[in-house]
């Protein structure tokens, strides 16, 4: 708790209370309380936090390192690191120099007396100094560190072995710390980086020397540390030429590792970074080095892989991961070297066959990269053919560079690997596995199915024939030489191909006929066969007899607890295919009759997800009936018991029947399930998915309507169902809405029920929108607004209201929308009010055209340095807009929808009041969720109002924003700059930058004039930033004048203002 990276020195601390003896005594009380009494722990922690914030800690913390108690040493080291990171600039130049010299001296002379974690902390502290002070205080940190152990860097044969590890530790941490340092500006980072890079070659030379040493226990430690250091400098993005071409380092590493398996793990990390850094950038310019390194890998690592498997050493996974990453990041480079790529894929597949299924998962991204290359080849071939037709003299394209035909054999072998690894265990039942292992196995089968499908999309008939041949062979050999597990794995993978198989489907009836004759009592095999039937519904929809036979076979399975779940899912999958559903609809009466035992009991349906699936499947089949009356009658027959239950629930609540708690919970659960069922019913008639802005996938992808025509065959024709039989759905929804209105009007209602109703209304709104029917939306809006005001405020209610806005006429004033926003805004102010959170008896105040909010004179003891003298602003000082981040987020998202689609329905005064609320409370917004919601809202409306200034309907809103800025603009900009300069946590500065960008782009003159006035004041936003630095910041902002203002401009301003960093 007290080792906090965010503490800053305070000047009002009594320094006299801190002595080294007192700090040690307090630390002993913390770590070793007498009689295990921890009652004083909070006071001890607070005292230690004060100590770390004090200036005395600069002199006392180093003395704690001399303690013989390791916990006290660690506290001292942590304090030193954090002081340097956050308060280094508070020291004078002489004090900095003395502190650095003493720290380096301690490391050189006392290293053997400290634990490893303490040394690491102190090395981190030194690296932070290097980031802060390179060039101005510490001229050559890399050179100085090298000379700790190699005093004459031109004679590497002479070195101090006692300090080699310290040198390597510092060399490892320096580039890592500089890369990740969030306490220096980008300009400073670049300066330090240039200085570090001057000595790259010497660093690699020393690492090469260490990797060449004769191996013993001590040098083995040096080598492991050297490999870690090597990895760090690779990630520092120094020139690859220095360690691939100009140095023998990589070769020396291979030599050392080949002689000692103990170095394999560390070298694997080096190689993995080398092949993956920035998407494989290192080897793009050094293909000869790629071939050399990969050849060496193929020489030694497959044997290490086998050895690790034999010893059950998990390092075999890391070896396979390296091979996978090589293919992922360098697939094109492999393609250019056929001999090397053949050896690579042979080794990869052999390792996969010997490894476990978790290792084989790593083949999946390899296949994805090959598939992408194949797609590129296909596209290039088409383009080349077109170009050749137009102009035969055109230079040939490089389609051969993407031709993967030479790898077809390996793709087929990968499919076989996935098939073998997808088999159920041969020596035990899957139920005997630990739950975690079983989950991993089934997750792998999903990955295997996806990967085989990718290969099928490349080779199509070859892969299908390969799987069918395997299946026929296994069936013929069963049970003599083949087991059901092999048959089941093949069937499972065949089912995964269903969405891509559109031709040559004659094998499907034959397949089911043969499978039906197998004398096997294996539940997994039966399950996979049923899944196959469900997935291949798009291929069997032309055969009425065959389809009805498959569905009829499901009904006995409904009575088997082990098969019921998969049978019901397959029945639902088949029913979702409109052609299959249409065929089955001819027998709907018989199907309902067969399901009668399930449908006869509401509780039985709602308590069992499988029964739920069966009922949903019947509703899908009903949706394809030819007449509206049939759809309405059969749907009502199935749904009426549940609608009646919901209505009776409301009646029972009104009568306040005395019920046992258990009975109440049962009824509540059944009520929730009934609402969910009705939502599922609506979903049948709407396959559009709603995004976070309330728009549909169709709306977002108007230009992609012709893509993926052969995919998702089970749902291709759902829209036809919607269009043909939508009137009965409207009738049922119309009957449900008043019932839900009664439920929402109850004085008490569980939040889960309100959320379920909100989800139903989301789906109902989308159905209305798809068919230009918006008559229900005003009533839905009214109900949800009432629910938000009457019951516990829920973010999901606001989310549904947001979607309702999208589906209403655009830019047309609607009274119910204005009333809704007015009431909800008042409720939000009540939620944010501290007083209302303590006492909910406060009356709801409604915002109208003359918004009237009672002035609260209580002072919140606000610590803001900016004082608000305006009474209008003072009344908002006691609000806590971060108290419920999710609700605040959805509220501002809802207003964003108003701005985007119906700004004319925003009551006058709401936006200006919200701006005032945020203005006053900016410095109290500490969480990212609230910050993103508030500042994105402000940035959008500032930008949008200016963009829409020519629109007459936007004139009132634009006038309101301009009027507010004319009154509070200077204070607003001052508060924004104060916040960016350290008034709010650094984690949310990125969102403040959005507001700055909107002001700079939409109101550049207003912003510049106010910013100049604020920044010209000495000490604003802090005394750490100079006048020249503030001028540079403002000039950088005005230079861009766009909504895409670089974040680093604002973050650098924040770091400098906080005194954490300087550009010098």
From Swiss-Prot:
Forms a complex with an importin alpha subunit. Disulfide bonds: none annotated. This is Importin-13 homolog A. Residues 40-109 form the Importin N-terminal domain. The gene is ipo13A. One of its GO terms (cellular component) is cytoplasm. GO terms for molecular function: small GTPase binding. Residues 695-722, 839-860 are annotated as: Disordered. Keywords: Cytoplasm, Nucleus, Protein transport, Repeat, Transport. Residues 700-722 have a biased composition (Low complexity). Required for nuclear protein import and mediates docking of import substrate to distinct nucleoporins. Pfam families: Importin_rep_3, Xpo1. It is found in: Cytoplasm; Nucleus envelope. Belongs to the importin beta family. GO terms for biological process: protein import into nucleus.
């Amino acid at each position: 708790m007290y080792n906090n990276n965010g503490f800053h020195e305070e000047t009002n601390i009594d320094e006299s209370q801190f002595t080294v003896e007192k700090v040690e005594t307090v630390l002993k009380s913390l770590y070793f309380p007498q009689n295990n009494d921890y009652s004083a722990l909070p006071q001890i922690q607070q005292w230690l936090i004060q100590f770390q914030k004090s200036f005395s800690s600069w002199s006392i913390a180093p003395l704690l390192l001399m303690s013989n108690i390791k916990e006290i040493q660690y506290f001292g080291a942590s304090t030193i690191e954090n002081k340097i990171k956050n308060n280094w600039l508070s020291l004078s130049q002489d004090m900095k120099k003395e502190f650095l010299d003493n720290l380096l001296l301690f490391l050189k002379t006392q290293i053997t007396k400290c634990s490893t974690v303490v040394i690491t902390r102190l090395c981190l502290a030194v690296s932070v100094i290097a980031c802060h002070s390179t060039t101005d205080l510490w001229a050559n940190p890399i050179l100085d560190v090298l000379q700790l152990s190699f005093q004459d860097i031109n004679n590497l044969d002479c070195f101090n072995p006692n300090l080699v590890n310290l040198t390597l530790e510092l060399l490892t941490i320096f580039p890592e710390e500089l890369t990740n340092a969030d306490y220096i500006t980008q300009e400073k980072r670049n300066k330090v980086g240039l200085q570090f890079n001057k000595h790259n070659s010497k660093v690699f030379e020393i690492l090469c020397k260490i990797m060449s040493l004769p191996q013993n226990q001590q040098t083995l430690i040096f080598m492991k540390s050297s490999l870690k250091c090597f990895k760090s400098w690779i990630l520092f993005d120094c020139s690859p030429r220095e360690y691939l071409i100009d140095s023998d380092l990589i070769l020396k590493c291979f030599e050392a590792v080949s002689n000692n398996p103990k170095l394999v793990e560390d070298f694997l990390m080096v190689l993995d970074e080398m092949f993956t850094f920035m998407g494989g950038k290192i080897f793009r310019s050094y293909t000869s080095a790629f071939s050399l390194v990969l050849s060496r890998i193929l020489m030694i690592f497959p044997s290490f892989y086998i050895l690790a498997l034999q010893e059950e050493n998990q390092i075999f996974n890391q070896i396979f991961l390296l091979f996978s990453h090589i293919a992922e990041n360098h697939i094109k480079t492999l393609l250019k070297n056929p001999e090397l790529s053949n050896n690579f894929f042979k080794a990869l597949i052999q390792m996969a066959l010997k490894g476990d299924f978790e290792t084989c998962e790593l083949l999946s991204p390899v296949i994805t990269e090959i598939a992408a290359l194949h797609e590129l080849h296909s596209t290039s071939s088409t383009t080349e053919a077109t170009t050749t037709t137009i102009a035969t003299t055109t230079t040939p394209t490089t389609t051969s560079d993407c031709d993967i035909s030479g790898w077809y054999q390996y793709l087929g072998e990968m499919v076989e690997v996935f098939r073998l690894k997808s088999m159920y265990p041969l020596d035990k039942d899957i139920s005997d596995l630990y739950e975690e292992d079983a989950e991993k196995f089934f997750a792998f089968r999903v990955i295997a199915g996806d990967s085989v499908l990718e290969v099928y999309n490349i080779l199509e008939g070859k892969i299908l024939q390969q799987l069918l041949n395997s299946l026929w062979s296994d069936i013929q050999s069963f049970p003599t030489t083949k087991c059901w597990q092999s048959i089941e794995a093949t069937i499972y993978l065949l089912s995964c191909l269903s969405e891509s198989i559109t031709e040559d489907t004659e094998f499907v009836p034959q397949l089911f006929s043969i499978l039906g004759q197998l004398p096997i009592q294996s539940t997994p095999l039966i399950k996979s066969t049923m899944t196959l039937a469900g997935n291949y519904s798009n291929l069997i929809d032309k055969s009425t007899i065959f389809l009805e036979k498959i569905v009829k076979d499901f009904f006995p399975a409904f009575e088997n607890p082990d098969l019921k779940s998969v049978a019901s899912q397959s029945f639902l999958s088949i029913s979702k295919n409109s052609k299959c559903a249409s065929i089955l609809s001819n027998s709907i009466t018989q199907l309902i009759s067969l399901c009668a035992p399930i449908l006869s009991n509401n509780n039985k349906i709602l308590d069992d997800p499988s029964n739920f699936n069966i009922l949903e499947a019947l509703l899908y089949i009903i949706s394809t009936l030819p007449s509206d009356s049939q759809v309405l009658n059969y749907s009502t027959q199935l749904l009426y018991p549940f609608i009646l239950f919901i209505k009776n629930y409301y009646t029972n609540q009104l009568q306040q029947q005395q019920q046992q708690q258990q009975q109440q919970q049962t009824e509540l659960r059944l009520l929730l399930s009934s609402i969910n069922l009705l939502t599922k019913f609506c979903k049948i008639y709407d396959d559009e998915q709603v995004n976070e802005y309330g728009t549909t996938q169709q709306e977002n992808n108007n230009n992609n309507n012709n893509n993926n025509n052969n995919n998702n065959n089970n749902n291709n024709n759902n829209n036809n169902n919607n269009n043909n039989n939508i009137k009965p759905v409207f009738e049922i929804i119309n009957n449900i809405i008043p019932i839900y209105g009664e439920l929402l009007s109850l004085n008490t209602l569980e939040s889960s029920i309100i959320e379920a109703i909100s989800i139903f209304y989301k789906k109902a709104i989308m159905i209305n929108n798809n068919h230009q029917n918006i008559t229900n939306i005003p009533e839905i809006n009214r109900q949800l607004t009432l629910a938000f005001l009457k019951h516990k405020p829920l973010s999901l209610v606001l989310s549904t209201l947001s979607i309702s806005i999208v589906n209403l006429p655009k830019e047309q004033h609607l009274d119910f929308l204005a009333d809704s926003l007015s009431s909800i805004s008042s409720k939000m102010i009540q939620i944010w009010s501290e007083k209302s959170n303590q006492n909910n008896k406060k009356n709801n105040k409604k915002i109208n055209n003359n918004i009237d909010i009672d002035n609260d004179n209580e002072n919140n003891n606000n610590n803001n340095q900016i004082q608000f003298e305006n009474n209008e602003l003072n009344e908002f000082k006691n609000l806590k807009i971060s108290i419920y981040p999710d609700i605040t987020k959805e509220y501002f998202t809802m207003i964003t929808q108003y701005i985007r689609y119906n700004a004319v329905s925003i009551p006058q005064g709401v936006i200006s009041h919200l701006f005032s609320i945020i203005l006053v409370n900016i410095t109290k917004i500490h969480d990212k969720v609230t910050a993103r919601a508030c500042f994105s809202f402000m940035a959008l409306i500032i930008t949008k109002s200016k963009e829409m200034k020519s629109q007459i309907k936007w004139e009132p809103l634009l006038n309101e924003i301009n009027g507010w800025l004319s009154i509070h603009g200077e204070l607003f900009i001052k508060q924004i700059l104060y916040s960016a300069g350290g008034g709010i946590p650094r984690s949310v500065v990125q969102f403040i930058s959005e507001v700055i960008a909107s002001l700079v782009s939409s109101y550049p003159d207003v912003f510049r004039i106010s910013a100049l006035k604020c920044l010209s004041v000495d000490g604003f936003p802090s005394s750490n930033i100079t006048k020249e630095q503030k001028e540079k910041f403002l000039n950088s902002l005005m230079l861009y004048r766009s909504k895409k203002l670089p974040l680093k401009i604002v973050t650098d301003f924040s770091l400098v203002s906080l005194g954490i960093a300087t550009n010098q």
